[in-house]
Amino acid sequence: MADVSILNKLRQQLALAGVDALLIPRGDAFNGEEVPPADERLAHASGFTGSAGLGIVRNEDAMLFSDGRYTLQMESQKASGWDCATMPEVMPEDWLLTHHRNNSLGFDPMLMPLAAFRRMEKKLKTGGITLVPLDHNPVDAIWPDRPAPPVRPAFDFDEAVAGLTRQEKITAMIDAMGDDSETETPRAMLISDPAVLCWLLNIRGRDLDHTPFVLAFAVLSAEGMVTVYGDDERFAGVSQSGLVVQPAAMLMNDLAALKGVVLVDPTSCPVALHKVIKARVIEAENPAVLMKARKTPNERAAFIATHQTDAVAMIRFLHWFDQTLEKRPVRETEIDAALINFRSDAADFLCPSFATICGGGGNGAIVHYRALPGQDQVIPKDSLCLIDSGGQYRQATTDITRTVATGTPPAAMAQAFTHVLKAHIALATSRFPAGTTGVQLDALTRAPLWQAGMEFNHGTGHGVGCCLSVHEGPASISKRGMRVIVPGMILSNEPGFYVEGEYGIRIENLVHVAKDETTNMLMLETISLAPIDQRLIIAALMTDAEIDWLNAYHHRIGDEIGPMIRARGDADLTAWLEAAIAPISR
């Protein structure tokens, strides 16, 4: 946990930098959700370890901001001297306009994307607040034992799985480079998103614990050459076709030397890199952002096969969990170890796709709760346990949530669970026309919960990368999901309901956006396969169509995964699965 003396040291750094306040984002130069330990500056300063957030340190106070997923976590983790607020109810800019008018705000220009900087700058100017780029990071200056940045080898991603060769992707990117210019075609493109870099080159990396990224910047030339800035040794084991590797220290000079027109994505390009480019800049979303979101037929097949592999691990885990709970108390931290153990039996398993979220009882109400050794609890009996986990496999990525009964929970929990299931089924069975946006599907999903007077404070669904980030843009199913949902996308379906201090419920499967030829509409094909806990379902609250969907889903598990379970020769496991997927009726 952060020490109050860190705040005092940061305030000394404010004076040395000549600014009145410091902005500390939870992010790195690549603006990713997961960052290496060397970039966990917000956690070092405040104690808060959530995957999204921002801190503001002034001489008078220190304020921590994150979204509704982390409200409870902020309160429990923040160090002495910090206050906290939940976005969007309280936005950092609004707080600054109330408390910090006519003052300066220092920031690290490598840690703020250009688009975010401009939005903040425009709003803060109305209150006379000046954003000041700093030539060093004040948190780094007071972090003597800061971990070293990762330097781990990259590896090739199977082109047979990708469905497109590196050269085919480079050609598509070059063709798209001219689409955003009505005059001169760009001569180069800055690649500032590691997901784009990995997708483009058909490579993956080990720089992060849960996301197979290579953390590096690159430049794609109009001639089809990709220059990557990083340690040579990291790229020694990957295909060198169309690839040049330069030391990271050369990035700034090479950007300054670019001629003609350069395409940059303002949502990921750091302010510091944009500043050094002297050539004319065209700003547009990197075309690969949508390209990689629309999975190729090969990638879709890989997702289906990988989810069958993951289903075996999940079924074995759920069986183990039930059996173990009957024999002895189970701690939350045991869950993560068990899931990794079962998934590791697959030869192509790489790592978890995120830190497992396992909350028993009231901890389940903390949307992104993470159990830590020595700080976790025994999972309570006669309650609920929310388990959100996933795996990175060499072919694809999984993300699945199951909420399970731990004994005989109160009827109110089963009632809430059934309403969440109804919301899940509403999205899973939806048909919608081309042009439908994520916000429209979000409302469709929430409608059954709203009818019951229920709501949840997170998005309904996010994109998922192919052995890339478990949270992938550009589309989402959420109240802010203004992007169109298009065929080929892999998205999550994860409505929930949470009662602070008592329990949390979430049911999550991944779905593939496909065409429904019978209605000329789009539809969602569920690809995650693991039993939904029928001990928590009140069939009387469900329609015939909802019961039919559940029974058909469980029948699929029996057909597709049942033979793989039976092949293990474990009669007890087989019997457990058969009971878990037995048809229900009123």
Predicted feature residues:
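Active-site neighborhoods and metal-handling regions in enzymes and metal-associated proteins
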Residues: 1-586
